[in-house]
Amino acid sequence: MYAPRELPIVHVSVRSSEMIKYASNDFLALKISYINEIANFCEIVGADIEEVARGMGMDRRIGSNFLKAGIGYGGSCFPKDTKALNFQSDHAGVKLKTVKATIDVNREQRTKLIDKARRFFPTFRDVRVAIIGLTFKPGTDDLREAPAKQNIDILLNEGANVIAWDPLGVENFRKRYPDCAINFAENIDEALTDADVCFIMTEWEKIVEYPLDNYKKYMRRPLVFDGRNCYKLSEVEKHEIFYDSIGRKIVDTL
């Protein structure tokens, strides 16, 4: 099974092998939470997290992998393994403070876009909200621990009218959350039509390549909150839009 790939085989104890898996995933999750905290600070001091992450990643001791700011990690591995290691350490009487901090930061980061949008909508009652992207990452229909569902629940509890689009995740969302009272769009144009605000939750290629002019064309007012930094600010500035992303300056050309 492994010989054709010429992979190194490390002989360790069962306990050590388990710890390698937990420690590796938790360290990667920590990198994500760390860069998200730095991104939040960048917004206050006027730095650009894309530039900061690029500079950090050039240091071989750090590396550029998992230094992508956004609205937190999801999926089946990182949430499960961070919580498991935190539980096991507590049970053993050891406080793994960095692991707990990783979990706490990620939990708060997941609703960052709603927090940002409060400047326009103290409450979302009767607000038409477009959710662009449902899955925890592009290229999958996996909704486990995806930030979109948590945000949708908050919006619905406040009385918002939510319409969502995702190229792969819609059917899985319907099956997984049959009682979730939202509408689904066939394409991004339909999701944006007459929307008061747009939240980008997943960096699908179709979103990255989506024409920025269309936000103004279809929305009542182009208020866009991007949780995955899908667009270059230099391109956003060429269009009539309010655009707030993660760890970067706000573009307001309205």
Q: What spans do the regions from the language model cover?
A:
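Structural/interface elements that position substrates and couple domains in central-metabolism enzymes
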Residues: 1-254
